[in-house]
Amino acid sequence: GPNGAGKSTLLKAIFGLVKVTSGSILLDGEEITGLKPNALVARGIGFVPQTNNVFPSLTIRENLEMGAYQKQESSVEGIDMVMGLFPDLKSRLEQRAGSLSGGERQMVAMGRALMMKPRVLLLDEPSAGLSPVRQDEAFLRVSEINQTGVATIMVEQNARRCLQICDRGYVLDQGANAYTGTGRELLEDPKVIDLYLGNLGK
């Protein structure tokens, strides 16, 4: 949806960062509306915000370990899993996150969320501010994460690219769901093209 449609607010509501005033949020049939973020993390929900998504004074390794703070076992297995998805980070684990590029910070943020082995991953604008090449990498990583069995809910301004890789899409308008369908259906829907995709949909 367009700017101000409520996309990021929706993710924040799911993750307990803003108050839900109506409706319900269910996870496998369990009511989770209004739970605090730490309770949602314990239930297997990870969240990657668009900005301020790393601890800049900590190393990459320390950032990843922060994501496993609720797990009792060693974080080594989790770090190995994250390095499999983001091999560019492997030789730089002791580098401070504050020195990384936007795309590299996004990798660290996604990796930290994955350290808890979430059932659901919420991603807010994973391609924001990235070069076209880095955007392609970000979408590839999102697809790979999803293929590991993690359900992924992604808010994304690059609607065309997002719809190309998603199972289902939801177009928001003024806080309400205006259109729903598979990615292909929405890419080919004349109303969605005219109202939201413009030339991007052609």
Annotate each predicted stretch with a short phrase.
Residues 1-202:
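Glycine-rich phosphate-binding loops of nucleotide-dependent enzymes
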